[in-house]
Every structure is written in C-alpha cells, then in structure tokens.
C-alpha cells in the first residue's frame, strides 16, 4: 500500500475533466476515507468512507449566514 499522490487525488476529485461539484468532492473524500480505513479492516473502510463523505458533503452545504437571518428572522 502506498500514499495517494497529489496528481492521483486531483484525477479522482474531478480535475481530469469532471466538473468540480460538491458531489465529486464528497465522492473523492469517501474514496480517500475508505483507503485510510483499510488498517481497521472492513468496518474501518465503511466508517472511513461514510464519515469522510458526509463531512465533506455537510461542509459544502454550510452557507456564510444562518438560516434564521437569511429567512428574515435574524436581528
């Protein structure tokens, strides 16, 4: 097993022609998380993929303002 190089990560995450979208970022993070979880066995792979994918997906949907202020309920 060897480390993923920067060029391989760019290829996985869409730099090779796919658009740089939130879905591609979450997918790339899930792949990296799965690879990072390999030492933990099958459960480590699943937990690594799910946690990395969800963290990236949630992080890409967080806006700069709160929901209440954007809906007019903020002060």
Curated annotation (Swiss-Prot):
Record-level GO BP terms: defense response to bacterium; killing of cells of another organism
Topology relative to the membrane: Single-pass membrane protein
GO CC terms, sorted: extracellular region; host cell plasma membrane; membrane
Subcellular location(s) per record: Secreted; Host cell membrane
Transmembrane segments: 30-50
Keyword tags: Antibiotic, Antimicrobial, Bacteriocin, Host cell membrane, Host membrane, Membrane, Secreted, Transmembrane, Transmembrane helix
Propeptide cleavage-removed residue intervals: 1-15
Purpose: Bactericidal antibiotic. Active on bacteria phylogenetically related to the producing strain.
Protein name: Microcin H47
Organism: Escherichia coli O6:H1 (strain CFT073 / ATCC 700928 / UPEC)
Gene name of the encoded protein: mchB
């Amino acid at each position: 097993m060897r480390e993923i190089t920067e060029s391989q990560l760019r290829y996985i995450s869409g730099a090779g022609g796919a658009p740089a979208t939130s879905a591609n970022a979450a997918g790339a993070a899930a792949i990296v998380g799965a690879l990072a979880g390999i030492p933990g066995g099958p459960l480590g792979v699943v937990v690594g993929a799910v946690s990395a994918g969800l963290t990236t997906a949630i992080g890409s949907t967080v806006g700069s303002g709160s929901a209440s202020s954007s809906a007019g309920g903020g002060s």
